[in-house]
Design a protein with these regions (language model features):
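Active-site-proximal cofactor/substrate-binding loop regions of enzyme domains
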Residues: 9-10, 14-15, 33, 52, ...
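A structural preference for short, hydrophobic beta-strand core positions in alpha/beta folds
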Residues: 26-29, 73
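Acidic, metal-coordinating helix/loop segments flanking the phosphotransfer/catalytic sites
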Residues: 28-45
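CheY-like receiver
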Residues: 43-104
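Charged/polar, solvent-exposed surface patches and flexible loops
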Residues: 16-19, 35-36, 64, 104
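Conserved acidic segment of CheY-like receiver
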Residues: 1-18, 26, 46-47
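A structural signal for short coil/turn segments at secondary-structure junctions
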Residues: 22-25, 41, 66
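Short, aromatic/basic amphipathic alpha-helical patches
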Residues: 14-22, 61-62, 86
Length: 104
């Protein structure tokens, strides 16, 4: 499984969990993730690990390019769940997340 991790900061714990699921490419900018998908084809999943407006910007970049890629937004702010639906994220999780939640 090819996974794109979109996050401005290094998230060691979450990255380690994702690496158990497949190959992880990390991007600190949603635009760079889109460029990678244009060059190398779509990812099986894009995981956004940013809160608030930063997370929303990542979602908008990814959804602006592809409505088909599986999009997971992980935030520590539960109040952004309605925005995740509006931005068509497939899944919204509140930190901390478990390996079990990521596998679902």
């Amino acid at each position: 499984m090819r996974i794109a991790l979109c996050s401005y900061s290094q998230k060691e714990k979450e990255t380690a969990l994702l690496m158990k699921l497949g190959k992880v490419d990390r991007f600190d900018n949603g635009v760079f993730c889109v460029y990678a998908m244009q060059r190398e084809g779509p990812y099986d999943a894009v995981v956004i690990m940013e809160d608030g407006a930063r997370g929303m910007n990542f979602c908008m970049s990814i959804r602006g390019y592809s409505r088909d890629v599986q999009l997971l937004w992980i935030s520590d702010q539960a109040e952004f769940e309605p925005q995740s639906r509006r931005l068509q994220a497939d899944t919204f999780l509140v930190k901390p997340v478990t390996e079990y939640q990521l596998r679902e």
